[in-house]
Amino acid sequence: MEDTPPSLSCSDCQRHFPSLPELSRHRELLHPSPNQDSEEADSIPRPYRCQQCGRGYRHPGSLVNHRRTHETGLFPCTTCGKDFSNPMALKSHMRTHAPEGRRRHRPPRPKEATPHLQGETVSTDSWGQRLGSSEGWENQTKHTEETPDCESVPDPRAASGTWEDLPTRQREGLASHPGPEDGADGWGPSTNSARAPPLPIPASSLLSNLEQYLAESVVNFTGGQEPTQSPPAEEERRYKCSQCGKTYKHAGSLTNHRQSHTLGIYPCAICFKEFSNLMALKNHSRLHAQYRPYHCPHCPRVFRLPRELLEHQQSHEGERQEPRWEEKGMPTTNGHTDESSQDQLPSAQMLNGSAELSTSGELEDSGLEEYRPFRCGDCGRTYRHAGSLINHRKSHQTGVYPCSLCSKQLFNAAALKNHVRAHHRPRQGVGENGQPSVPPAPLLLAETTHKEEEDPTTTLDHRPYKCSECGRAYRHRGSLVNHRHSHRTGEYQCSLCPRKYPNLMALRNHVRVHCKAARRSADIGAEGAPSHLKVELPPDPVEAEAAPHTDQDHVCKHEEEATDITPAADKTAAHICSICGLLFEDAESLERHGLTHGAGEKENSRTETTMSPPRAFACRDCGKSYRHSGSLINHRQTHQTGDFSCGACAKHFHTMAAMKNHLRRHSRRRSRRHRKRAGGASGGREAKLLAAESWTRELEDNEGLESPQDPSGESPHGAEGNLESDGDCLQAESEGDKCGLERDETHFQGDKESGGTGEGLERKDASLLDNLDIPGEEGGGTHFCDSLTGVDEDQKPATGQPNSSSHSANAVTGWQAGAAHTCSDCGHSFPHATGLLSHRPCHPPGIYQCSLCPKEFDSLPALRSHFQNHRPGEATSAQPFLCCLCGMIFPGRAGYRLHRRQAHSSSGMTEGSEEEGEEEGVAEAAPARSPPLQLSEAELLNQLQREVEALDSAGYGHICGCCGQTYDDLGSLERHHQSQSSGTTADKAPSPLGVAGDAMEMVVDSVLEDIVNSVSGEGGDAKSQEGAGTPLGDSLCIQGGESLLEAQPRPFRCNQCGKTYRHGGSLVNHRKIHQTGDFLCPVCSRCYPNLAAYRNHLRNHPRCKGSEPQVGPIPEAAGSSELQVGPIPEGGSNKPQHMAEEGPGQAEVEKLQEELKVEPLEEVARVKEEVWEETTVKGEEIEPRLETAEKGCQTEASSERPFSCEVCGRSYKHAGSLINHRQSHQTGHFGCQACSKGFSNLMSLKNHRRIHADPRRFRCSECGKAFRLRKQLASHQRVHMERRGGGGTRKATREDRPFRCGQCGRTYRHAGSLLNHRRSHETGQYSCPTCPKTYSNRMALKDHQRLHSENRRRRAGRSRRTAVRCALCGRSFPGRGSLERHLREHEETEREPANGQGGLDGTAASEANLTGSQGLETQLGGAEPVPHLEDGVPRPGERSQSPIRAASSEAPEPLSWGAGKAGGWPVGGGLGNHSGGWVPQFLTRSEEPEDSVHRSPCHAGDCQLNGPTLSHMDSWDNRDNSSQLQPGSHSSCSQCGKTYCQSGSLLNHNTNKTDRHYCLLCSKEFLNPVATKSHSHNHIDAQTFACPDCGKAFESHQELASHLQAHARGHSQVPAQMEEARDPKAGTGEDQVVLPGQGKAQEAPSETPRGPGESVERARGGQAVTSMAAEDKERPFRCTQCGRSYRHAGSLLNHQKAHTTGLYPCSLCPKLLPNLLSLKNHSRTHTDPKRHCCSICGKAFRTAARLEGHGRVHAPREGPFTCPHCPRHFRRRISFVQHQQQHQEEWTVAGSGAPVAPVTGRGDLPLPPPPTPTTPLLDPSPQWPADLSFSL
């Protein structure tokens, strides 16, 4: 800054600026001239100052933004990789990557030294000096006092009392407009005229439509021009910001300013850019509004506001002699381009709106005073004509009136009328002789423009209209009227919502928010006119365009009459004649009166055809040109990318075309509902179709005569209807298709999308073709009245002839005199058109967005009408030429013609023929036919090449238009076509084309080839020759003839639904929808209902394409022959090149086709089973085949996947797939708005949103549960199948889970799960980008990153009460149901014979897992049982005795709770986890005959000896191994005798029993093991690390471990009395110690070997340890502190947190935790949302288990424990004991384990007394059950 030249420094504050515009802006803001109008405060406070450089800012967001410039470092660009030194430089650089349409085009700031700004920056004398040389405003207007007649102006004193006593001369001026000279000179300072123009001159201007309405609004104009003396600044700016001190004149400005202080993170919903305050976000959102209608006539720059255009044009002041920009046009009143103004330079007077259109509808050409007898009773305003008064009265009809052509909300009928007028401005038309007919500009406008060109600086800052309350001045009177609303304070309530506002302006701004909702609402008719028919009804805007030579007065008058169909806000408005203004009480009277205006209309209503217009509508992005604006609209939607969300179902789309296609599906459902209500009467259907045809013709022609239909009938509707067909061209080519598609688009939206509704489409097409019998008058100007009343064709107005005003009388007469008006949607008939208009809002319209501006419309005709206001773009010279037959793209016309002659034999076609016309029209602008447009895939290709800079020099991909295949080079595509054309021999099917030409024959060949490919999967030359059988020919329904392309441009018709297509490839693609069945993907096991869905699946999952070839109902997708249908011969390849050479004959092809067409469900199931059996291989073979598939995909990617990602190198067949994939590289923080979950890229967010948005269509027929995807339903239905069949019919687990990990042996059902799992083996240094934590593998990092999102999910096994774990393999499950299904898998595996395992069955494996790998995740289902090892030697099997028993042991020992032993007896009976938490145990298989002998006394309610131990096992029935059930026997409950077919059912039954469970420390009794475990933590948290032998306490478990090892060396065994402590920490042993406070949900057991490779066997404990060699192989990650090993590095990292001991306080509560893992688990109690709410009391809980426990509170009976002293009942023992203490009875609970007196409970069963210290906890005699499973 210090090096800036002193010439650019501010003279007041000495600040330096890099450019003169910034200095000028600085002086305007901080150092304004003291006499400048709208004077700012002397100094604007800048309270936010940078601490490093001292720079000050007014807003905190500016300071935050500025501070980024001081952050030094290395900031790389994620798009191009360029590095920057600070974030601000990176932010500025990122704008260069933004799409061109979103960049802000800022006009250059006006320089201070230029003379044209002196009116703004240099103070002039006053407003009086501007208006006159020596007079003020009062003196200038003094002359109006002389006229005594006050009817010429409204009574000023009757309005608001703020008018001064205006002189007579001013009244004269208000009564009559000045002449041209006075009008021009009266504004300049050089004249001495004493007259000032009272109103701006009526001419074309850029005055906004809202200002036009406000000029005539209900707020009376109360004296605009005030004296120049403005009130002091402190009085003007009454509203002061309390934070920064900035003052404002209006409360709304202060409210807007306060948004800059709302600091936070505000992301943009379109580009996800984040901002620090709301104001910055609001300003940024304007960048996405791409609406820049103001074009500079000298250069190609466009601007958003007229002010910007004014400032920019001042730079061209010295360049007037240069040729102006010919391609652009003048902005018109509505802000769009006006071709009629091309020859006129927009003057400042035109741009600033000083020439205003009179809303009364006439021009006052003289200054003579006229009689004004018509006075408004509400405001006193007078008019000369009754029609003007009628028009004015509409301004008092307040309400919400939405415009049907744009998103504007208007507040009275007059405003709507004035606004609609802007959409129907006359544009440059075609006269009778073909010459452009431009309406002559009025002399007044020409002279005014000439005067201002001479002195351009006179009116730049002329603001004669000043507010008397705040002093603010405006250029336009309408702006002042609009501003005065802000001073109308009070309480204004919105009529659409309960919000209230302090002034009228705030209310009106708020109402705009309801724009979209009000437009789409069904009850909008109660508040305004039907939104989608307001502008389509009047014929006179079209008439005004057809009569460009009429007088301007007539144009204005006719526009007024055209929009004079009063939109009734309350449905009680009077009926007004739009011609003479008379009012009638009912519609019948108005109808009779309208007949009087109908004379003399027929002479002026002849129709004549017009010349075919040139292709004047060119796409600015790709240069493609069209004849009609609607075609360009459809095309532009393919370039509109972003995040478009559906308001109905919250789905998101990335192109506007995709969203619009989706929205039609919602409209289709609504249309079907209305048609069902209408009934099936034939008469109603005929009336419906006739009305629809009439509506379609009128809506099509009412768009305007500037783009009439060609002879070919090309229309935007046809283009719209074809947009969604992939591979189809975008324009219709016949009148029949046009009408059918138009009607389908307008009134039966969505029906054309459904393949099953083709019959209705055919019926609609036939009906419309019968009704539309006008072969030569497609371009005629049919009016709406004609279509409704049956006006003869000879009454239609001529296109090039001026029409008199009497035609509107005939139009209105015809409209009112119609016999019956029928709704095209529901068939209801109405006697009058007004009834139909009122009824139309009952059918919600669609949504159509303009591709050039953000406006939306309710109907396609409205969009077409709006689009005329946009100037069509110019065709670029480098436009590619696309061949519609094969998809090849050529850079020049010569190459395209050569290709057409050589490849398609189209030498006989003329240049003006159908196919040639498209490209010829680009340069010659006069084609004779309307050709097909580009394929949708080619459009995506063009867009992709513009986005990716690396593809600038690359050639276009070549797409075959018949089969859809894409080729990198032209040679490949030519060879592809040669292989097709070589099959045109005598042995191919007889073509019904006749002599249509070789081009059509080749299309048919391609179609036949693709059909055979889709049936047999082995397409090629042979198939194109052999596959053309009779069924295939019939299915195509190809129409023949010499001129096939001209007479029937859509020859390919589906014989099932009747839908027609231009290209055979489109029909082939469509027919896959009808090939239904269960199409099962062999790789990912997903099932699809039809071939089209399966093909889409293959497109998105490239790994599936390289899988094993399939048979049965799994056909391959056309054009992508990776998967084949039908058996593959040996040696066959799955590549398309080899498929062409080998395949079945003609009979086999037809047979396969018939099988695909009609295949019974039984056959489908049989073939499906065969496929499953054939594709199921052994687990060892799957990994090589996966690798082979990957290599095959990579090989094919080089030839058939031309679209590769430049970031990761992944390739795709279609450009759209690549665009979709590239979203995965758009990294950042993307939050879900529904659940606030965060994602790192857009693709993840998009996939996640489907969870919330997608409907759950697939419902289970047995339980009613619904799912989003079919595969989810299939997975769910397996549960029902297993329960019904007992698992006997299911195949081995390995077949269900064919994907095995080569490193750890884990198996998965889906390949994606295996890929996801492999990340856990990718070790390295992975750091979290959010926090400084590092992880050793990618899976651990991914799991960790979930913690940073707001919605933290608990992972399985981490939950305290809800997660359950399998004791056999250690896998965790979220609930008992999942565990039961998992246990059945173990059960089935155990029933199979142990092949090669030496007799070791599942029981031994289960117990081995209990010993060696308890709690760890092992391979599920397909894993081999791990044999139990003792001293490194496998033990073949010990079925009669548990293998975990030692040789000298007499009692079996499960894993003790402390993982140690005390005196040879296990301390606890549950599974020990690492933290010492209690893991209750459940019996998995309690299958036993009813007569089996119970050797253990632990049964029912009298388990007394082993009570404290076995009560935790939840009805654990100990029995002999000999009493085990054989496979096939039933399981019976030992308590109630109930039998079950499966052990899981018995497990669920036993879990629900109210058995007693005791705490080992205090002998408290509980009803379930979960409560017991929860209670045990209270003891753990309250005690320290104490030695059970000597009682010495230690600070950490390491010290205790060392101390216990010292005890072990001194004693050969631990005395049996040690178990008296009943301390869960009392686990002893040299090699394993588990201490309290180390977490509660670990995935590994507490058993710890002494050291790596050391095998320890305790003499008295009899515990066998698996060999460390095998353990090291399976568990390579070992903890260095305690020696525990894990399979995954993430598990080890998670475990190591348990060693970080100390006091870790919770930040949300005063609780202290002993280690990080406990703190992490505890923090979930605060952060996890409480999703489970009680339906009775509303209390919320984190888990379903807690809600279930809470539900017992509301149960009728509280529990089995009844207090003998009071009637209370208790469900839990602890509650009962605590209650007893209140009664001071003799039973108390001793904390040291004192016995509790028995209390009589439910059933009078005595409670077992707690064990005494001298009683051993376990009887050494009973045997352990054969198969155990533990769960939480």
UniProtKB/Swiss-Prot annotation:
Keyword Ribonucleoprotein attributed: no
Polar residues: compositionally biased ranges: 798-810, 1406-1417
Acidic residues bias spans: 912-922
Bias (Basic residues): 94-108, 661-678
Chief localisation class: nucleus
Record location of the Glycyl lysine isopeptide (Lys-Gly) (interchain with G-Cter in SUMO2) cross-link: K451, K534, K557, K688, K1157, K1168, K1178
One BP term from GO: regulation of DNA-templated transcription
Residue numbers carrying Phosphoserine: S612
MF-aspect GO terms: DNA-binding transcription factor activity, RNA polymerase II-specific; RNA polymerase II cis-regulatory region sequence-specific DNA binding; zinc ion binding
Cellular component GO terms held in the UniProt record: nucleus
SUPFAM superfamilies per the UniProt record, alphabetical: beta-beta-alpha zinc fingers
Region of interest called Disordered, as start-end residue ranges on this chain: 26-47, 94-200, 313-346, 660-810, 901-931, 1103-1148, 1274-1294, 1377-1481, 1509-1529, 1606-1672, 1781-1832
Biased composition, class Basic and acidic residues, residue ranges: 313-329, 735-767, 1378-1393, 1427-1438
Compositional bias (Gly residues): 1460-1475
Pfam families: zf-C2H2, zf-C2H2_6
Entry keywords, A to Z: DNA-binding, Isopeptide bond, Metal-binding, Nucleus, Phosphoprotein, Repeat, Transcription, Transcription regulation, Ubl conjugation, Zinc, Zinc-finger
Subcellular location: Nucleus
C2H2-type zinc finger locations on the chain: 8-31, 48-70, 75-97, 239-261, 266-288, 294-316, 374-396, 401-424, 465-487, 492-514, 575-597, 617-639, 644-666, 821-843, 848-870, 881-904, 958-980, 1052-1074, 1079-1101, 1203-1225, 1230-1252, 1258-1280, 1299-1321, 1326-1348, 1364-1386, 1557-1579, 1585-1607, 1677-1699, 1704-1726, 1732-1754, 1761-1783
Task performed by this protein: May be involved in transcriptional regulation.
Homology family: Belongs to the krueppel C2H2-type zinc-finger protein family.
Protein name: Zinc finger protein 646
Source organism of this protein record: Homo sapiens
